[in-house]
Regions:
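Short glycine- and basic-residue-enriched patches
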Residues: 27, 63-79
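Non-transmembrane domains of secretory- and envelope-associated proteins
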Residues: 2-9, 97, 106-109, 118-178
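Hydrophobic transmembrane alpha-helix bundles
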Residues: 31-44, 75, 166-177
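Short amphipathic alpha-helical patches
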Residues: 10-17, 68-69, 164-168
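Solvent-exposed, flexible loop/coil residues
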Residues: 59, 74, 82, 96, ...
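N-terminal mature ectodomain segment of secretory-pathway/periplasmic proteins
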Residues: 1-53, 79-131
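Acidic/charged, solvent-exposed loop-and-adjacent secondary-structure segments enriched in E/D, K/R, S/T
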Residues: 49-70
């Protein structure tokens, strides 16, 4: 489970993620507010809105999400925009974590604190910080099972089960980390 907070509002989601060779499958169900399930197979993303009987089809941009933003392959290295400081160790959702802080080099960017699981590097918690270091929003796992058995076939079947839904192709808007 992931719990996130922005502007004092809390939301929670349940996430499944599995890798089979070079295929990644993921499902994210919102547990707060309007029901929504998002299923991803590599870069193909489908979001099911059961109340509206709509499913949107989208293509995810490679390199546009964490942790790829920290990779020089994503464009300019993160060090061009941030000073990176190791803050030590902590625990999130029962897992030992390394904590780093990204301090912006200019006034146009937010700062970040990131907790990553020691063994896998999986991001367990993030905080977005203002110029004074105050937390603007945060997201963290509240429960996590690494190496838990996930039925990849069930995730694949959900992507194929669009009967009774109106299919909408999402419009693409290219973004950059800068």
């Amino acid at each position: 489970f992931v719990v996130s907070s922005a502007s004092g509002a809390l939301s929670s989601s349940r996430i499944w993620h599995v890798c089979e060779g070079d295929v990644q499958l993921e499902r994210v169900d919102t547990l707060t507010g309007t029901p929504r399930s998002t299923v991803r197979r590599n870069d193909t993303v489908m979001t099911f809105l059961p109340d509206a009987r709509v499913v949107t089809l989208d293509q995810r941009q490679q390199g546009a999400v964490f942790p790829n933003l920290l990779s020089p392959a994503a464009g300019q290295p993160v060090a061009d925009f941030y000073d990176v400081r190791e803050l030590g160790r902590g625990r999130v959702a029962g897992c030992d974590a390394d904590i780093v802080q990204l301090l912006p080099r200019d006034a146009w960017r937010f700062g970040y604190r990131i907790w990553s699981e020691n063994r896998t590097g999986l991001v367990l918690k993030t905080q977005t910080l203002d110029a004074q270091g105050r937390v603007l929003e945060q997201a963290a796992f509240s429960e996590l099972q690494l190496d838990a058995p996930v039925q990849a076939e069930q995730l694949r079947q959900m992507m194929a089960s669009t009967q009774g839904y109106r299919l909408v192709q999402a419009e693409q808007a290219r973004t950059t980390p800068q």
